[in-house]
């Protein structure tokens, strides 16, 4: 709630001062401030000349911050920046090669979300790996990313068939959606 309130205040204030403040938060010693700074940089409108700098700050946080919470927020914010400017898609692919294997569940979930924002078949092996993650939220976001981007191959379909038995209801629903969309008759076994 604190993040959203902070972001709204800064969005309303807008301008370079708000961007500078968010950037300053990103290098704070306190992880909560870094998390808020990363969140704000994903949401706030920034000038074109600042985009590269902001994306690079977020990417650096994604790969190097000590706090898994901050890394996850930075990943989500890079995805938000990418939605505003798809030129950053290759950088999302590149960072995902690392973050998809992070020990933090939140980082892996954020990675699956970030991959859902881009459409790059190079991410399919990462998504298939995330479909097999021990955490249901990660599996659900990976399945969502596959479905939203309409990726299809036999490995994806086989994973979706296995996911029909998943203990997580949202994962099962994404698997049903995925198999139905692909007109795979194995969905009828549900």
Where are the language model's segments positioned?
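Amphipathic alpha-helical scaffolding segments comprising HEAT/armadillo-like alpha-solenoid repeats
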Residues: 13-27, 47-62, 84-100, 120-132, ...
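Short inter-helical turns and helix N-cap capping residues of alpha-solenoid HEAT/ARM repeat scaffolds
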Residues: 29-30, 66-67, 103-104, 134-135, ...
């Amino acid at each position: 709630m604190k993040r959203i309130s902070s972001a709204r205040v800064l969005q309303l204030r807008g301008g370079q001062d708000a961007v500078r403040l968010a950037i300053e938060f990103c290098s704070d010693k306190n992880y909560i401030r870094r998390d808020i700074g990363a969140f704000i940089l994903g949401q706030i409108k920034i000038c074109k000349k600042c985009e590269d700098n902001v994306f690079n700050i977020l990417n650096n946080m994604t790969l190097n911050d000590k706090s898994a919470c901050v890394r996850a927020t930075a990943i989500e914010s890079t995805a938000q920046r990418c939605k505003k400017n798809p030129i950053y898609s290759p950088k999302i692919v590149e960072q995902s090669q690392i973050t998809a294997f992070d020990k933090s569940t939140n980082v892996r979930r954020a990675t699956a979300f970030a991959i859902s924002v881009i459409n790059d078949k190079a991410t399919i092996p990462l998504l298939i790996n995330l479909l097999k993650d021990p955490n249901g939220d990660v599996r659900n976001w990976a399945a969502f990313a596959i479905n939203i981007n309409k990726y299809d191959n036999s490995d994806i379909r086989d994973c979706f068939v296995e996911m029909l038995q998943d203990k997580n209801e949202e994962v099962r629903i994404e698997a049903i959606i995925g198999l139905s969309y692909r007109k795979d008759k194995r969905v009828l076994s549900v």
